[in-house]
C-alpha cells in the first residue's frame, strides 16, 4: 500500500513540477530559450497534455495505464481544448481570450495535481480493486524494442518529409495564421479578406489549438507544425492504436505486436503522394480530418469497449465527450465513430439479446450520439433555413462553390476515391479492398472474428465495424443515399476509414493467436520452448526485413521531393515568405500564381491573394460543368490569375490588376513577365531577400504606360 501511495504521489508531483517548469519556460525564459525551440515546444506540449493525462490517470487507470496513458490524455486534452474554443469562435473573440481560458484550465489542473501529490488522495479509477488493467498478464517485455524502433522510423520520416506544395495543409495554416494576426477568431476569411458567415470554421477548435501552440511556444507556425507537431502526432497515432489494441486484447504484448504490424503497414505504403496510406500518415496528421481518423476514432472505440465490457460510467462519459469534441475538430469524425458504433452495438445486442445490461449500455451510447447531432440539426435549419449538411458543405474551409465540391470527386479519377455506375449510383472506389495487405487481412479476419463474435466484445466491435462500414460504402444504394442525403459524395471514402483500422487490428489478433497456438504446442521441447517465447518479436523482425525493399522504394520519392522542394523554395520556404510575415502590416492584395500564392496567407495574416488554388477547378471545369450544367460558378480570380501569368495584353493585365485592387505582383526572377513589368510604369521592385522571385509594388493609377515615358521625377 505504501509503495502504491508513493507511486501515486510521485506521478502527480512530477506533473505539477513539469507543468510549473513549463510555465516558467514559456512565460519568463522564452527569449533566453529562443535558440532552442525544441525546449519551448516540449514545454508547451507538457502544458497541453497535463489536464488530459491527469484525468486519464485519475479515472481511467484500469485500462489506460503506462504508455496507454499518453494517447488517452492527448485525446482528452485535445477534445477539451477544442470544445473550449467553440464559444470563443462563435463570439469571434480574440486568441488572447482563448489563451486566458486555456491557461486557467491548465493552472487548475496543475494545482489539483499538486494537492493530490501532497494529500495522496485516490480517485475512482485508481481504486485498489482488481480491474481490467490488473488482468493484463502479458507485459510488453522485449516487444517494446521493435515497436519503439518502428515508431522512431515513422517519426523520422515525418520529420524529414517536405509538405505538399499545393495541399490542404496550406489552407488550414492560413486560417491559423489569421488567428495569430489578432482580431476576432473566424471573423475574416484568410485568402480574400471577406467576412466569415455561418461556417465550419466557426466551430473548428483544432485550428485554434494550433494557433495557441504557436503563440505559447513562440515557434514559427509553419516550422512548428512540420518540424515538431507532425512527428509528434505520428508517435501519438501509433500509441493510440496500441491503446485500442490493449483494451480489446487485454495483453500488452499482443497490443505491441499489432502496433508493429500497423506501423509496418504504413512503412510498406510509404510514398510522397498524400494519396497513399503511408504518405498520408507521415504528411497530413496536423490536418483536422486526419486527427479524427487517427486519434479520436480509435480512442472513442476504446472508451466504448471499456464501457460495454465493464459498465463503468466514467468510460461512457469519456466516450460521449469524445463524440462531442470530435464535432469541434471535423464533423466527419463523428460520422465514422457513429458508423462504427452502430455496427458494434448491433452485434453486441445480437450476441446478448436478453441482457438488460447490454441493452442499457448500447442505448445509452446511442442516445448520447443522437443528442450530440440533434441540437445543431435542429438549430441550424431554424436559423438559416437550410439543412445542417448543406450549411457545412456550402461553407467548408477548403471549398468555394458547393456544387463544385459535390462534383469534384467524380472528375478526379486519379485519386481513386469513388466509383460511379452507369445509372448514376456510386460506391467508394474498390482500391481500398484491392490493396493486397488489406484484402488478405480482411478475408482472413472475417471468419476469425465470426468464430469469436458470440463471446468476445473485441470481436463484436471489430466485426461490426468492418461489416457495417463495408455495407455503407460498398453497397450502391446505401452509399448513394448517404452521399446524396447525409454526407457529400466526396466524403464517402472517408466513411471507410474504420475499415483499415479494424481490419489490421483483427489481422494482428489472428496472427497473435496463431503464435500462441504454436507456442503451446512447442512448450514441451526445451530449446523450441525458449524460441517460442520470442516468436512474436522474431515475426516482426522477419516482416521488417521483408518490408525493407518496399520501404526503401517509398523513401526515395520522399527524399527527391524534399530536395526539389528545397531547390524550388517551397520548403524550407523562400525568404520572401517570411518577408511577407514580417513586413506586411496592413491589408494587402498580392497577385501570384496559384502555386506560389497558396503559401502566402499561411505566412501573413495581412496578405490576401486573388486565387485560392483555383487551377484545381479550372483543370476540370468542363467536366464539372457537364455534370452540373448552369450551376457552376466560374472562379473569376482563378481565371484572371491563369490569364495574367500565361501571357496577356497590357490592357487585359491592367483590367485584372484594377479588378482585384492588387497592391503587389509576385513573379519569377528573370522571367519574361519580370522583364515586361520592369519596363512599365506603375511597377516598382520592392527590396526583399529573395533571389528566386521579384515583388513589384503596384500603383494602379499609373500602370500601363511604357517606363520610358515616365518623368524621372515622377513618384511611384
Q: Where in this protein do the model-derived segments appear?
A:
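Membrane-embedded, hydrophobic transmembrane alpha-helices
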Residues: 1-137, 477-484, 491, 505
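Membrane-helix boundary/interfacial segments in multi-pass membrane proteins
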Residues: 33-43, 91-99, 164-165, 272-292, ...
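Hydrophobic/aromatic-rich transmembrane helices and adjacent perimembrane loops
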Residues: 44, 231-234, 289-296, 335, ...
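Membrane-interface helix-loop-helix junctions at transmembrane boundaries of multi-pass membrane enzymes
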Residues: 136-139, 252-257, 311-313, 352-364, ...
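Active-site lumenal/periplasmic loops and adjacent helix-entry segments of GT-C-fold
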Residues: 142, 146-296, 307, 332, ...
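Transmembrane alpha-helical segments
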Residues: 155, 268, 329, 333, ...
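Hydrophobic, aromatic-rich transmembrane alpha-helices
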Residues: 245, 345-352, 435-459, 506-517
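Extracytoplasmic
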Residues: 546-716
Amino acid at each position: 500500500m505504501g509503495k502504491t501511495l508513493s507511486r501515486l504521489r510521485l506521478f502527480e508531483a512530477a506533473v505539477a513540477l513539469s507543468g510549473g517548469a513549463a510555465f516558467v519556460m514559456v512565460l519568463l525564459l522564452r527569449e533566453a530559450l529562443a535558440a532552442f525551440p525544441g525546449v519551448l515546444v516540449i514545454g508547451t506540449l507538457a502544458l497541453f497534455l497535463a489536464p488530459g493525462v491527469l484525468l486519464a490517470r485519475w479515472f481511467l487507470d484500469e485500462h489506460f495505464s503506462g504508455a496507454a496513458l499518453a494517447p488517452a490524455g492527448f485525446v482528452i486534452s485535445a477534445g477539451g481544448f477544442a470544445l473550449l474554443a467553440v464559444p470563443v469562435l462563435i463570439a469571434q473573440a480574440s486568441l488572447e481570450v482563448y489563451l486566458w481560458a486555456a491557461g486557467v484550465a491548465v493552472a487548475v489542473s496543475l494545482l489539483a495535481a499538486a494537492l493530490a501529490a501532497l494529500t495522496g488522495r485516490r480517485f475512482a479509477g485508481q481504486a485498489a480493486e482488481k480491474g481490467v488493467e490488473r488482468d493484463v498478464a502479458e507485459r510488453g517485455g522485449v516487444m517494446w524494442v521493435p515497436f519503439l524502433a518502428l515508431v522512431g522510423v515513422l517519426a523520422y520520416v515525418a520529420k524529414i518529409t517536405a509538405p505538399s506544395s499545393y495541399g490542404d495543409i496550406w489552407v488550414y495554416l492560413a486560417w491559423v495564421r489569421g488567428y495569430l494576426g489578432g482580431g476576432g477568431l473566424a471573423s475574416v476569411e484568410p485568402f480574400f479578406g471577406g467576412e466569415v458567415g455561418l461556417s465550419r470554421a466557426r466551430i473548428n477548435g483544432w485550428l485554434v489549438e494550433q494557433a495557441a501552440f504557436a503563440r505559447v511556444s513562440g515557434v514559427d507556425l509553419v516550422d512548428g507544425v512540420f518540424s515538431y507537431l507532425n512527428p509528434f502526432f505520428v508517435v501519438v497515432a501509433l500509441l493510440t492504436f496500441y491503446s485500442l489494441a490493449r483494451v480489446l486484447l487485454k495483453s500488452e504484448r499482443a497490443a505491441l505486436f499489432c502496433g508493429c504490424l500497423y506501423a509496418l503497414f504504413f512503412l510498406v505504403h510509404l510514398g510522397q503522394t498524400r494519396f497513399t496510406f503511408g504518405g498520408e500518415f507521415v504528411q497530413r496528421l496536423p490536418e483536422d480530418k486526419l486527427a479524427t481518423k487517427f486519434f479520436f476514432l480509435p480512442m472513442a472505440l476504446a472508451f466504448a469497449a471499456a464501457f460495454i465490457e465493464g459498465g463503468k460510467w466514467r468510460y461512457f462519459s469519456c466516450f460521449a465527450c469524445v463524440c462531442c469534441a470530435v464535432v469541434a475538430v471535423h464533423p466527419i469524425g463523428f460520422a465514422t465513430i457513429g458508423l462504427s458504433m452502430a455496427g458494434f452495438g448491433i452485434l453486441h445486442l445480437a450476441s446478448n439479446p436478453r441482457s438488460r445490461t447490454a441493452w442499457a449500455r448500447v442505448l445509452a451510447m446511442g442516445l448520447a450520439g443522437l443528442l450530440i447531432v440533434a441540437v445543431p440539426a435542429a438549430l441550424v435549419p431554424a436559423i438559416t433555413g437550410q439543412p445542417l449538411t448543406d450549411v457545412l458543405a456550402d461553407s467548408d474551409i477548403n471549398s468555394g462553390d458547393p456544387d463544385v465540391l459535390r462534383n469534384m470527386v467524380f472528375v478526379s479519377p486519379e485519386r481513386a476515391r469513388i466509383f460511379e455506375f452507369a445509372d448514376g449510383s456510386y460506391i467508394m472506389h474498390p482500391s481500398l479492398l484491392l490493396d493486397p495487405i488489406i484484402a488478405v487481412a480482411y478475408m482472413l479476419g472475417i471468419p476469425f472474428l465470426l468464430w469469436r463474435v458470440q463471446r468476445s466484445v473485441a470481436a463484436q466491435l471489430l466485426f461490426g465495424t468492418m461489416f457495417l462500414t463495408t455495407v455503407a460504402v460498398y453497397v450502391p444504394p446505401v452509399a448513394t443515399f448517404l452521399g446524396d442525403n447525409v454526407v457529400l459524395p466526396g466524403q464517402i471514402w472517408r466513411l471507410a476509414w474504420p475499415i483499415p483500422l479494424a481490419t489490421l487490428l483483427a489481422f494482428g489478433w489472428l496472427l497473435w493467436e496463431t503464435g500462441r497456438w504454436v507456442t503451446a504446442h512447442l512448450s514441451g521441447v526445451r530449446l523450441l520452448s525458449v524460441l517460442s517465447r520470442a516468436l512474436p518479436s522474431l515475426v516482426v523482425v522477419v516482416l521488417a526485413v521483408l518490408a525493407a525493399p518496399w520501404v526503401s522504394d517509398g523513401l526515395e520519392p520522399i527524399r527527391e521531393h524534399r530536395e526539389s522542394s528545397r531547390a524550388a523554395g517551397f520548403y524550407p520556404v523562400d525568404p520572401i515568405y517570411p518577408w511577407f510575415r514580417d513586413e506586411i502590416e496592413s491589408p494587402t492584395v498580392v497577385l501570384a500564381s496559384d502555386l506560389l500564392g497558396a503559401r502566402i496567407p499561411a505566412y501573413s495574416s495581412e496578405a490576401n491573394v486573388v486565387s485560392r488554388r483555383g487551377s484545381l477547378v479550372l483543370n476540370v471545369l468542363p467536366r464539372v460543368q457537364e455534370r452540373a450544367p448552369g450551376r457552376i460558378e466560374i472562379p473569376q480570380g482563378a481565371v484572371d490569375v491563369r490569364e495574367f501569368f500565361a501571357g496577356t495584353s497590357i490592357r487585359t493585365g491592367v483590367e485584372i490588376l484594377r479588378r482585384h485592387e492588387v497592391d503587389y505582383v509576385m513573379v519569377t526572377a528573370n522571367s519574361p513577365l519580370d522583364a515586361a513589368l520592369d519596363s512599365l510604369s506603375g511597377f516598382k521592385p520592392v527590396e526583399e531577400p529573395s533571389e528566386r522571385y521579384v515583388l513589384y509594388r503596384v500603383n494602379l493609377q499609373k500602370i500601363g504606360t511604357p517606363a520610358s515615358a515616365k518623368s524621372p521625377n515622377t513618384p511611384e
